[in-house]
Swiss-Prot record:
Residue ranges annotated for the Guanylate cyclase domain, each copy included: 876-1006
Species this protein is from: Homo sapiens (Human)
Residue ranges annotated for the Protein kinase domain, each copy included: 528-805
Parts of the chain that traverse the membrane: 474-494
The protein's name in its UniProt record: Atrial natriuretic peptide receptor 1
Amino acid sequence: MPGPRRPAGSRLRLLLLLLLPPLLLLLRGSHAGNLTVAVVLPLANTSYPWSWARVGPAVELALAQVKARPDLLPGWTVRTVLGSSENALGVCSDTAAPLAAVDLKWEHNPAVFLGPGCVYAAAPVGRFTAHWRVPLLTAGAPALGFGVKDEYALTTRAGPSYAKLGDFVAALHRRLGWERQALMLYAYRPGDEEHCFFLVEGLFMRVRDRLNITVDHLEFAEDDLSHYTRLLRTMPRKGRVIYICSSPDAFRTLMLLALEAGLCGEDYVFFHLDIFGQSLQGGQGPAPRRPWERGDGQDVSARQAFQAAKIITYKDPDNPEYLEFLKQLKHLAYEQFNFTMEDGLVNTIPASFHDGLLLYIQAVTETLAHGGTVTDGENITQRMWNRSFQGVTGYLKIDSSGDRETDFSLWDMDPENGAFRVVLNYNGTSQELVAVSGRKLNWPLGYPPPDIPKCGFDNEDPACNQDHLSTLEVLALVGSLSLLGILIVSFFIYRKMQLEKELASELWRVRWEDVEPSSLERHLRSAGSRLTLSGRGSNYGSLLTTEGQFQVFAKTAYYKGNLVAVKRVNRKRIELTRKVLFELKHMRDVQNEHLTRFVGACTDPPNICILTEYCPRGSLQDILENESITLDWMFRYSLTNDIVKGMLFLHNGAICSHGNLKSSNCVVDGRFVLKITDYGLESFRDLDPEQGHTVYAKKLWTAPELLRMASPPVRGSQAGDVYSFGIILQEIALRSGVFHVEGLDLSPKEIIERVTRGEQPPFRPSLALQSHLEELGLLMQRCWAEDPQERPPFQQIRLTLRKFNRENSSNILDNLLSRMEQYANNLEELVEERTQAYLEEKRKAEALLYQILPHSVAEQLKRGETVQAEAFDSVTIYFSDIVGFTALSAESTPMQVVTLLNDLYTCFDAVIDNFDVYKVETIGDAYMVVSGLPVRNGRLHACEVARMALALLDAVRSFRIRHRPQEQLRLRIGIHTGPVCAGVVGLKMPRYCLFGDTVNTASRMESNGEALKIHLSSETKAVLEEFGGFELELRGDVEMKGKGKVRTYWLLGERGSSTRG
């Protein structure tokens, strides 16, 4: 690689020296409560990913979030000032950018600089800000040179960088076994700011340093075909794994020429470094991604050539927060910047500016909280580095040098339809390659080509240049080898035939049609539930039967009349390779009373499963955590010995090791014999690991050396099994759960992190054992020793257990008989306790149902009857709401609004209990009540609602708002009488709803009413006059939407009552 190109010239250093003295005299700054962000980005040219038209909306969204969150810079105002990094031609300039930065520093003394994004523009500005001790934050400037913190001490990159691309390629080389040679080509185009040069520079330096391999590089001009010819002559002598940075059209041209030259066969692979996915049409959508397609008559050849091509891009975030952010970003860009933003990977740049700015604001907030100032650039920058942050682009991690860990995607062509799709993703945070489920890299030979030809690039391997043997020598050699081969084959042929016959017979195969769900499984499936005794991953659970027996179940079924345990396998299909067939054969060969018997396996998609012996007593973990089961030490030693015997058989057999030994994989049969399950069949292990808390909880038994491996062996190791046994031994001894640490309440994740870290002394469970168990504690410590070589084998463990368990070596039968008597007594108490709990829960459920639905409707549902909709000839409906509620809500916090409505409707609910009415619903500030249904009350419904309305109005006059005690709550009420239809709507959260024009008219009476008055329709007035005693006042004709002019009345009060409207 040629020497690094300095992104800024010496004239800028002189400019810096001339401008610094007056800058040092500058006293103006970011005053308390006012933080200034200086933006140095292209303001006119929107072709840059970091142009202000793209980044500006993202900054606006970030500042809006800061303003909305009280925990970020409380009492401060954040403002932005703009400076252009473009010259007069609209191109990023290494002169315009630093001048703009100096002007902004002089005029505004900002607390932070945002941008530039272009490499040559960012270099001088980064040096200036380091000298000024002002942080610089950018999602551009991806070149390798910005990682030199001697020059760019306060530069933080929240976006992708080319050095991280090198990390991805290094991981890819390790995965594919390319550890000797690579070739990198980069295109040069006038005016392109040497984008490809800086990209290949980061790739070149990082891959060479990470892998210590030979990396060659070549530059070519995109518009000069003679350069393409020169490249094609050089490629066969320089590399087989080739990385190319160029435009999509140039890459296609180069691939077509390579096809003509015979370089697109199985010996070559070409990676197009198209980081923004321009050749893939960008964006999201169902359209096929065919970068080879142009419609120019060469598509057939181009598709053939692209079979040897892969494409590397940034990973497109697909989290919901990012998708919602894009919607807001596009809308804001169009509304405020008159810019139409298209879909594409380029949108990750403004999103990264958004996340970076929020991270900076968080760092400033923390600095202020610790007594610092916004001008303490070094402290603020250090708070941003080596830190994780959840942003709209997902999980954002800034490393210790201020660079974001970047995710990448590898695209490959589907040979069936020619479309490119993602087959591999790289997680920059964990530095792991994650294959996309159901997809794989396409290789002509079925495997990756070697990075160096078999005989070297120039046939320099001496093995390929030996002189040819004579014909006689060849014949003699062939004859000797043939004779030797015949003797060897004759010796093994019979044994091999027998083995092949056994493999071909497939005695292990189970047809899914022969597997019948057990009665227990059918009952659980029909009930829509699954019962388990422990929530920590056990495959077995326990329940209480009507016979008073403690039954234990897994996913069970009947196969050939026998009850078996069924373990579902999370795979789409199982390829029956010889490796898999041998695994199945080894499982059938296992015959040991302390290992669950392998019944067979079903490989018929989608019902892929493993059938094993069913042990009805559940797992060891279940038994240890069930406090109702008493375990004396004789019984515990018996269980421990069973584990040792089973593991001793595994370690001495063809399976060699377990790899997943834990208490939930130790099950107990009906005779209380412990058996180990879930061993062998590594090809049947689930592909997709569980996430979150569960994955850490399942690793609590895993040895530290296996935890530190990126891809530990599926079978684990024998020393790892001994470590797992030590953890189980502590579970059995203390019965306090897995990995119990006295005095500490740690999550599984915290435990795994401390074990993996390798503390001194090693972090292990507690050993708070009784005095007579000291020898058992010493055995545990030896089993979970940090050095695998120091752990004893199971043969030695067996001898050790025999030494200090001699006094408990009597027959276990007497102990089992007494224990079964204890179970019978305990189960009677459990049945009574759970019956009472059931009755209490039934009472609570009925009370809740009566609150949701009318009593008569609820009783129908309890009897299993269908609630039919019912028509009512005459009911009276009440509507009310709060005048000015919208304005009141805007001036109050959400909690104050919730408190207000809760106080008000609690008051209302207490009032309406005194009347023959039914509360239908409350929505926001609206309150709806009806009388006359579901139980008819003749014509009394109007009187009941009128009296209730007067009572509510009286209660409102004395009601006080907690956070505004001086204000009077203004209630507006409307009442109407007429026919309705009522019924229960929905299955989930069913509601008793009213339908009909009467409901709409009652709502119109409320909306056309006045505050603190009761508005009546003429229909309600007519019913009230039948009873007399109510004071009414004619309001007149009111224009109502959809009704025309309607004559209405005010309800003033009831004669003989103190309540008045």
